[in-house]
Curated annotation (Swiss-Prot):
Name of the featured protein: Sulfurtransferase TusD
Function per UniProt: Part of a sulfur-relay system required for 2-thiolation of 5-methylaminomethyl-2-thiouridine (mnm(5)s(2)U) at tRNA wobble positions. Accepts sulfur from TusA and transfers it in turn to TusE.
Molecular function (Gene Ontology), one example: sulfurtransferase activity
Catalytic site: 78 (cysteine persulfide intermediate)
Length: 128
């Protein structure tokens, strides 16, 4: 089966994102196809490279990046939701008084059109 995952929860404070990550790992271990992960609403905070968990806590942002590197899973971040929550890529800074963006590597800003395309080609979409 071909899956798209929609993450709407932040990396910390709820279990949405960590459960989504564990589900993605399970999908890949059982040889399903994970087309993409789309971060929306507070889920865009998973792409904030300024998030710094305690040293003894699981670093979910690094885990998502590892999933991208190891399995080439696309990590899409809703552009509008990201801007509302202060997640900005370096290329968007020319209109703002900010020196450096905080969009983590491996994540890419996109619109809802990417989510729609993913839904169209996948067998299942699951929201966390």
């Amino acid at each position: 089966m071909n899956y798209t995952i929609l993450v709407t929860g932040p990396p910390y404070g709820t279990q949405n994102s960590s459960t989504a990550f564990l589900f993605c790992q399970s999908l890949l271990k059982t040889k399903h196809i994970l087309h993409s992960v789309f971060f929306y609403c507070d889920g865009v905070l998973n792409a904030n490279n300024m998030t710094t968990p305690a040293i003894d806590e699981f670093n979910l942002i690094n885990a998502w990046q590892g999933l991208n590197k190891k399995h080439q899973v696309k990590l899409y971040v809703c552009n509008s939701a990201a801007l509302r929550r202060g997640v900005i890529e370096d290329e968007k800074l020319f209109n703002m008084n900010v020196k450096k963006g905080n969009l983590a590597l491996s994540f890419q800003l996109s619109g809802l059109i990417e989510l729609a395309k993913s839904i169209k080609i996948c067998d299942r979409i699951i929201q966390f």
